[in-house]
Amino acid sequence: MTEADPIRVILVDDHAMLRKGLRFFLAGFDDLELVGEAASGKEAIRLCVELVPDVVLMDMVMPDMDGAAATQIIRQQTPTVEVIALTSFQEEDLIERALQAGAISYLLKNVSAETLAEAIRQAHAGHSTLAPEATEVLVKATRQRAGQHDYGLT
């Protein structure tokens, strides 16, 4: 890939209207190219193997196969592909499952276009982006777990 080549992106969401909106959003950035869309985790895996995109925008809650399961398989089969979890949910277990499955970033669907574009660029460069809400959930959970342990420190 040369400096002028756009970042190749696949959208994965079971809601056609959301994919349409993201398609429109991506068209506004010269450095981002939509190369495929999937409505399910299984379809996403097939597309990633076939097209080997740079970045996948992955919904986490879908019927049939959820985004975390699809992310794990995509990362195993195409390890150069970075996955951004893009969801409406900010529950601790979902955030942890997405990151443990191999997602490099976790964003909420209310993210601004500029923030999402920058997160795609950062993911392509190997850097993480977490929604502030996700960061807050993880910090609270970690602090709660730390408070449950007596480390014998004085």
Please describe what each predicted stretch is.
Residues 31-39, 47:
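Short hydrophobic/Thr-rich beta-strand motif most characteristic of the beta2 strand and flanking loop
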Residues 40-43, 65-69:
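Acidic catalytic/metal-coordinating carboxylates
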Residues 62:
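Receiver (REC) domain active-site loop signature in two-component systems and cognate sites
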Residues 46, 68-80:
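Short amphipathic alpha-helix used as the core "switch/output" element in two-component signaling
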Residues 5-18, 22-26:
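Conserved acidic segment of CheY-like receiver
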Residues 59, 87:
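Active-site residues of response regulator receiver
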Residues 93-100, 104-153:
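Short, flexible helix-to-coil linker/hinge segments that flank and couple to helix-turn-helix
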Residues 51-57:
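Active-site beta3 strand of CheY-like receiver
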